[in-house]
From Swiss-Prot:
Compartments reported by the entry: Cytoplasm
UniProt organism field: Alkaliphilus metalliredigens (strain QYMF)
UniProt-listed GO biological process terms: bacterial-type flagellum organization; mRNA catabolic process; negative regulation of translational initiation; regulation of bacterial-type flagellum assembly; regulation of carbohydrate metabolic process
SUPFAM superfamilies: CsrA-like
GO cellular component, as recorded: cytosol
Cross-referenced NCBIfam families: csrA, PRK01712.1
Principal cellular location given in the protein's record: cytoplasm
Protein name: Translational regulator CsrA
Pfam families: CsrA (PF02599)
GO molecular function, one term: mRNA 5'-UTR binding
UniProt cross-references to InterPro entries, sorted A to Z: CsrA (IPR003751), CsrA_sf (IPR036107)
PANTHER family attached to this UniProt entry: CARBON STORAGE REGULATOR
């Protein structure tokens, strides 16, 4: 893990397209601003983990495909 120290209004770059800037430090919390291309998905870690869990649960559900049988018969 790379560990960096940054002061208020300082930034770090991830590659050439993603900038993470320290917007403020208050009451032990750091406020970050992230500039990235629109196709880059950005999530808080706890939200990302919830999405992963939901996707896994959805993929493990058994599906009843019998209702679709009639849609794919040749006429």
């Amino acid at each position: 893990m790379l560990v960096l120290s940054r002061k208020n209004n300082e930034s770090i770059m991830l590659g050439k397209d993603i900038e993470i800037k320290i917007l403020g430090i208050e009451d032990g919390k750091v406020k970050l601003g992230i500039e990235a291309p629109k196709d880059v998905e950005i999530y808080r870690k706890e939200i990302y983990l919830e999405i992963q869990e939901e996707n896994k649960a959805a993929s493990e559900q058994k599906q009843d495909w019998s209702q679709l049988k009639g849609l794919f018969t040749k006429k």
